[in-house]
Amino acid sequence: ILKELNWDLDSILITHHHSDHIDGVDRLRSLTGAKVTGAKSDAHRLPKLDFSVAEEDIISVGNEKAQILDTPGHTIGHISYYFRNDNKIFTGDSLMSLGCGRLFEGSHKIMWKTLKMFLQLPPETMIFSGHEYSISNAKFALSVDPKNERLILREKEIQTLLKNELFTVPTSLELELETNPFLRASLPEFKANLNMKNN
């Protein structure tokens, strides 16, 4: 594909150690010479890293700069790459369209801290996740937030996009704030839907 598009691959950014994110990294590196970046704290579970990074580190990716954010929960060593100047973030499996990654290693408290960190980003931030689970996540979101008019509309928009073989990601933080149940979990109206205490 790279040859067909006349593109060069010079950077591989790893968010976490799961096989669906790292299988093929060594082969890609050998074919392209791309440099591999990943979390220093998780290096023992990752392919050989050219750059080991930690929270707040700034790296160069092409002509852009990315800030490393610790985003544990899905896995303990999960990181995200925040391109502040472009309002883009590569979240891997920590935050997705209408959802977040399952807790394989972290706790609910750890994941909640990560989700609250995402809430601090500018609403115009574009979220590039590691998977496109938009339709299944929409069905779950509607099961816990059935009166959310924007969510109802979004589920229809997703159906239309998929019917036309179009992507549903990236998404914007602004849209996620309106429709993602994991980012809305502290809102009184959301808690009321689930008969949760407001504390």
State the predicted function of each range.
Residues 1-67, 153, 157:
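Active-site HxH/HxHxD metal-binding segment of metal-dependent hydrolases
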Residues 1-7, 46-145:
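Catalytic core of the metallo-beta-lactamase
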Residues 13-15, 34, 131, 166-167, ...:
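Intrinsic structural disorder
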Residues 39, 75, 172:
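Residue-level signal for threonine
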Residues 116-126, 135-199:
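Accessory terminal helices/loops
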